[in-house]
Amino acid sequence: MTTQTSTKYSIEVVDYDADLVLQCATIQSTFESPSRDSARSKVSITTETEEKSEDELRSIRGTVVESTTQKPIIQGSFFPYEFSEHEQEELKEKMAQLNHCLEDCELDYSFEGTIIRVFYYKKWYISTHRKLNADRSKWGSNVSFKRLFEQGLADSYGLSLNELYQQLNLRCNYTFLITADENTRFVCVPNTAKKVYFIRSNDPQERFITVAKPPKPPQSLTRVEQIFAWVKALQYPYTYQGLLLTHKSGSQYRIINNEYATLFKVRNNEQSIPYRYLQLRVAQDDASIALLKQLFPQYTATFQSHEQSVDWLVDVIYHEYTKRKQRSLLPSDLTTTPQIDQRMYLFIKNKLINKGVITKERIKALLWMEEPSNLNQMIRLVNHMRHVREKSRSPQLEADLARLNLNSSPNTTLPDGDGVPKRKKIKYSKIPVELTFKKPSPF
């Protein structure tokens, strides 16, 4: 398959079903920390080869087409051009390059949240930018975006999905926003008036939709300088990322507060906050760790638990390393190697065996240099081992051990080895055959 590219961008097929295909351009946020391409959920790449401009590619963000005819069903959202609060001149240059005027743009708040598209094609679809079925999409939570959408409609408007469908036109498509909650947020504090907002549609009768549109910024922001000054004045804790300009052609420009951009890069596009802590800890980024704790103080105990788990992991690895080192001194026919987790085995083999003097401090330092994914798996394993061990010590066993300790003198040790008295064998008498169930032999 070939890749359709323009500079560093390409178009991917990110989801499909029997009828539809979902396409998305590969564009990373300017303020996101670099990530591995392998971490991206990718199905395949489109086979088109004609060149597209960057502006055209940015509009392919969740484009839905028929699988057989490639006929567009829904045009994608636009991936905004992004600027920090100090990049005022860069914004003006980009707008001039695209022949865009500020007077032709609509100004909105830039929210943290998830875009939901609702449309009908043989059945009702509730989709995200990367999933045709939002029930198969989740981030930072065990609850799918479809379920969050349903909950938001019910909590904010008393609407069910079926009641919403009755307000929609089968021939039109609709865009909604699920605002971020405590689990799905990056930096902003979730304190919006509604959990779901109606953004736009191609329905001329959209005024009958009872889902509210998001609040608007001050109307006094009519010049680029005023827009940037307003964004710069934002302070933590944030309600908005910044401001969003939408040109009548569909192109968008997002202006982000600098401190927000710093905190966003600390949080990054990583679902698990404890795992993000591991990434920063391995990178020895103490400044970012402090900011992460500021953003999510409720996870402080979890971060401390990770540190303790690594200490337990050190003990386990040191024990296994010592056993293997001792066995290496035995003849090969007497050597046995107990099975352990593959990651631990490879860590011992590649980092410890024949690497000089190994101490627990050395093992701990090496562990904090591991790939976060490997370290995370080893932490999960050692936590599981501890859980199984603690679970196996039943209350009855604990009571028996306590009773044994109470009945034993501190200076008395239980006999072991040769000191243990042997049990006497019980001698049995011969039983007359007539008293058994056996028939007497005729001979």
UniProtKB/Swiss-Prot annotation:
This is Immediate-early protein ICP-46 homolog. Residues 82-110 form a coiled coil. Belongs to the IIV-6 393L family. Keywords: Coiled coil. It comes from Invertebrate iridescent virus 3.
